[in-house]
Amino acid sequence: RDLVRSRGLGDVYKRQKDSFVEKVADYQSYPDNWNFKGNKPCLVDFHAPWCVYCKALSPILDQLAKEYEGKLDIYKVDVDQEPELESAFKIRTIPNLLLCPLNGKPTMKLGTMNKNQLKELIESSLLSE
């Protein structure tokens, strides 16, 4: 239930709270100073099914998951189904992207972007190390 195959375009992971704590961040134990737990950089898309901008972003993330397969993990968190994650990461507006580089501090990026803008963001924020 955690891994969703996206029409053959690549793997996009839908995160629930327990697997988020295990694979991305233990925000419960360290709410103000958590560390990224992954072995590849990741992008976490906080979204909702009713959000028009989120719907536009979703297929782009599916494409990027395929393009960056093996280099980057892309996760999706439905804030309607995961209110604890929404609250823990202070998500007030969606779409909201959490960028977790292997080294360095995670950052948030608010709003939607086209594919080229997202690729630039991934390259500069997550894969430039």
Per-range role (PLM):
Residues R1-Y13:
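Single conserved hydrophobic/aromatic residue that forms the stacking wall/gate
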Residues R15, F46, A65, E69-E84:
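Thiol-based oxidoreductase modules, predominantly thioredoxin-like and allied folds used
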Residues D18-V21, P83-E84, N116:
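Acidic phosphotransfer microenvironment of two-component signaling modules
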Residues N39-C42, F46-W50, T93:
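Short pre-active-site segment immediately N-terminal to redox-active cysteine/selenocysteine motifs
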Residues F46-I60:
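Conserved redox-active cysteine motifs that mediate thiol-disulfide chemistry
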